[in-house]
Regions:
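Extracytoplasmic cell-surface/polysaccharide-interacting catalytic and binding patches
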Residues: 1-53, 147-150
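Catalytic cores and adjacent binding grooves of peptidoglycan-active enzymes
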Residues: 2, 80, 85, 93-152, ...
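Extended, low-complexity, intrinsically disordered C-terminal regulatory tails
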Residues: 46-76
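Short connector loops at helix/strand junctions that flank enzyme active sites
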Residues: 55-57, 84-88
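Glycine-biased, low-complexity coil/linker segments
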Residues: 156-158
């Protein structure tokens, strides 16, 4: 592994966790981020992921982080995906209770842009998609708890519509 991939973005998260992709490896896609994307990933770690990890004291597995344009296209990501900017990550959640706990904690304690609890009932996959914009003032605090994605793998970004404010989401949970 080269030095760039070993780079710590925060105490518990490395660049390689954001860039590793079996699909990219299989297809020979170079999924290396640029400097701005690395800064955005660091911001996401500092603002949301690291505080979440510190609070629960357990490892968090990123299933999809940074995606170059070619990889995003292959996995069916949306054209303006925040994954391509280094602003988004999908997190594996072992069960719905953990998803609910993490979701509520993120809404109440972090400055995020978008938070979706996504799931595919046919494939029985569930994950949290979260993002944080580089410019903190532009974070929308869009949170949708029960966002169903039709038969999509956890590395695919949802195409959701609608939103609620952090306060509304807290009351809905």
């Amino acid at each position: 592994m080269n030095k760039q991939n070993d780079m710590q973005l925060s105490e518990h998260f490395t660049l390689s966790e954001f860039t590793k992709s079996i699909t990219a490896e299989r297809l020979g896609i170079d999924n290396k981020p640029g400097y701005e994307q690395m800064l955005a990933m660091r911001r996401l770690c500092q603002e949301v992921l690291e505080p979440l990890r510190q609070h629960y004291g357990k490892p968090i597995r990123i299933t999809s982080g940074y995606r170059c344009e070619a990889l995003n296209r292959v996995v069916g990501g949306v054209g303006r995906s925040q994954h391509m900017l280094g602003e988004a990550a999908d997190l594996s959640v072992p069960n719905e209770q953990v998803a609910r706990d993490w979701f509520q904690w993120i809404v109440r304690n972090t400055n995020f842009d978008q938070l979706l609890f996504e799931h595919s009932s046919r494939l029985r996959n569930r994950w949290l998609h979260l993002s944080c914009k580089w410019d903190r003032k532009r974070n929308r605090h869009q949170a949708i708890y029960n966002y169903k994605v039709s038969n999509s793998p956890p590395s695919r970004e949802g195409l959701g519509v609608g939103s609620c404010t952090a306060g509304t989401c807290k009351r809905q949970l």
